[in-house]
Amino acid sequence: MVRILLATSTVELEDLVKRAIEGDASAELVLIARSGREAVRMTGELLPDIVAVELCPSGDDSAETVREIMIAAPTPVVMLSHRDGSQLGTISARALEAGALAVIPAPAAHGMQLEQPAIEKFLSTIKAMSQVKVVRQWRQKVRGDRAAKDQPPTARTPIGIVGIAASTGGPAAIRAILKDISADLPVPILIVQHMSNGFIDGVAASLNATVPLTVKVARNGELLKPGTVYLAPDNCQLGVSGRSRLRVSDDAPVNGFKPSGSYLFGSIARAFKGESLAVVLTGMGDDGTEGLRALRMAGGKAIAQDEKSSVVFGMPKSAIGAGLVDLVLPLESIAENITAIARGRSEPEGETRT
């Protein structure tokens, strides 16, 4: 049985969650926390399998609640939204960066009745996320700026584009990478991040405010610029048109994913061939693997996040198992490798896979 702790001050959300769970013998709502502080305390005392935290536009800081849970009693956390996602984008981005696994919509009601497909999706997501192994986080110490490193001389032909695919745990991993890449990166970065609709604008805004690179949601036909990060919009496929422009389309899902990492990797492979670099980050499932086949056949390079630093090792494991990855790296080493490869230098050392 999955034991759920709900953190909400909203009677409406409490009622929706209770009604969704009451008909499922494999799920139990153990208690309701009325504040972030209560949620942290109850998590340590009750040891639930998962904590569902309401995304609040006011009051307690949702991100701080997640952060404190990860420090005091590491437990899978999902954020629940029952409002317009566009109003909560920045808040959700901070919560995901703090360690929340996903933002999911609360079960939807039609009149007095809950919609059965919404109940099933809600419960299946809660159960899947409750199985994720999370690790304790530590309070960050203030550190001085790192001294700039001398760049090794150019040793190889540089790449022209970077594609990144991520799912569960991705927002925090993406931020960890982008904060360590300087604004003068000579190539653009395109990112597919699986998440609920309505939150990608907030993620882009949050990243743009906290990392050296320019971060935005991709627009069809936009010119590719170096040092710029483009995030796939909701329910759209992201790729390139030739070597100079973005292509944002309503093309069909690839293996159920839209946006899809495989779609992105295949698109950049066709345009940039051996001058493309793909990075597969933490996430459930196997998105990205199919696209890596095309990218590797075109001569491109691929990096996968290692198991220890992944929240969920599904996507990287699939890519590694298929023999499509050049380097398997801990999260903290990926930015350095992207920068080195983009500048045409020999890659910093990592675990090599061929």
Swiss-Prot record:
An example molecular function term from Gene Ontology annotations: protein-glutamine glutaminase activity
Enumerate the catalysed reactions.
[protein]-L-glutamate 5-O-methyl ester + H2O = L-glutamyl-[protein] + methanol + H(+); L-glutaminyl-[protein] + H2O = L-glutamyl-[protein] + NH4(+)
Sorted alphabetically, the keyword list is: Chemotaxis, Cytoplasm, Hydrolase, Plasmid
Query: Record's InterPro entries?
Result: CheB-like, CheB_C, CheY-like_superfamily, Sig_transdc_resp-reg_Me-estase, Sig_transdc_resp-reg_receiver
Give every Response regulatory domain span: 3-121
Which EC numbers does the record give? 3.1.1.61, 3.5.1.44
Q: Which residues form a coiled coil?
A: none
Outline the extent of the CheB-type methylesterase domain.
158-340
Provide the protein's localization. Answer: Cytoplasm
What family is this?
A: Belongs to the CheB family.
Function per UniProt: Involved in chemotaxis. Part of a chemotaxis signal transduction system that modulates chemotaxis in response to various stimuli. Catalyzes the demethylation of specific methylglutamate residues introduced into the chemoreceptors (methyl-accepting chemotaxis proteins or MCP) by CheR. Also mediates the irreversible deamidation of specific glutamine residues to glutamic acid.
PANTHER family, per this entry? PROTEIN-GLUTAMATE METHYLESTERASE/PROTEIN-GLUTAMINE GLUTAMINASE (PTHR42872), PROTEIN-GLUTAMATE METHYLESTERASE_PROTEIN-GLUTAMINE GLUTAMINASE (PTHR42872:SF6)
The molecule here is called Protein-glutamate methylesterase/protein-glutamine glutaminase of group 3 operon
